[in-house]
UniProtKB/Swiss-Prot annotation:
Keywords: Toxin-antitoxin system. Disulfide bonds: none annotated. This is Putative antitoxin VapB16. The gene is vapB16. It comes from Archaeoglobus fulgidus (strain ATCC 49558 / DSM 4304 / JCM 9628 / NBRC 100126 / VC-16). HAMAP family: UPF0330 (MF_00794). Transmembrane segments: none annotated.
């Protein structure tokens, strides 16, 4: 088990998202898994109906939306 720190506003939002006796870890995992499923659903919806160049364009647009946070050592 690991400890993480989040801003107060993030804590409050996670607290509101909890269902029943769900832990914060459960909430975060649910959010992550939901995001993965949406990505898979999008790919399945377009599978076979787009040309390779159209699919590549969509993939590149989605990659640009993805933010990576860098950490100073």
């Amino acid at each position: 088990m690991k400890n993480i720190m989040v801003r107060d506003e993030v804590y409050e939002k996670l607290q509101k998202m909890k269902k029943g006796r769900e832990s914060f870890s459960d909430v975060i995992l649910r959010l992550i898994e939901g995001r993965k499923k949406r990505g898979i659903e999008i790919l399945e919806r377009y599978a076979g109906s787009l040309s390779d160049s159209e699919l590549e364009k969509i993939v590149m647009e989605e990659r640009r939306k993805f933010r990576v946070r860098s950490f100073d050592s």
